[in-house]
Amino acid sequence: LINAIIQEITGDQNVITTSRFPGTTLDKIEIPLDDGSYIYDTPGIIHRHQMAHYLTAKNLKYVSPKKEIKPKTYQLNPEQTLFLGGLGRFDFISGEKQGFTAFFDNELKLHRTKLEGASAFYDKHLGTLLTPPNSKEKEDFPKLVQHVFTIKDKTDLVISGLGWIRVTGTAKVAVWAPEGVAVVTRKAII
């Protein structure tokens, strides 16, 4: 963001070195502006509840989008599941058939299946059809933990550091995320 601001103001490109690895800014960077004011880039805050802490360096691209995220809407019936690669899972337990909009990195492959047998499907296909993690990384990946929510209004279900799913109608849902990764709700932002 700061590089984009600097480019807009001065025309200079890539003034600040960026990294997809979290926590690599070591100290405050002070950028002077023509009017005598400054922009400050500060080290980010590392939150242990974010997905990045459970991924290999190669897989950080799934939580650090380089392009604008293209939301994908899925029309789900009750008792359907949406896998978020192998990183998480969304279960539509009950409610009327409705659209759920997923906001995740464009490279993360989402897979729809029936809720019945979804856990066995995950165990069988983690590391192959459901990636990341790949087959070599899956043994070190934390187990998924279920978080159940009853939604009554437009709500985002957020998997910390990965993305979110917008729910627009009344529904009982479950979000599965790696143990240690926070799952929270918020009023829908879009």
Regions found by a protein language model. Give the residues of each.
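Post-Walker A alpha-helix
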Residues: 2-6
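Helix-rich effector regions associated with P-loop NTPase G domains
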Residues: 9-190
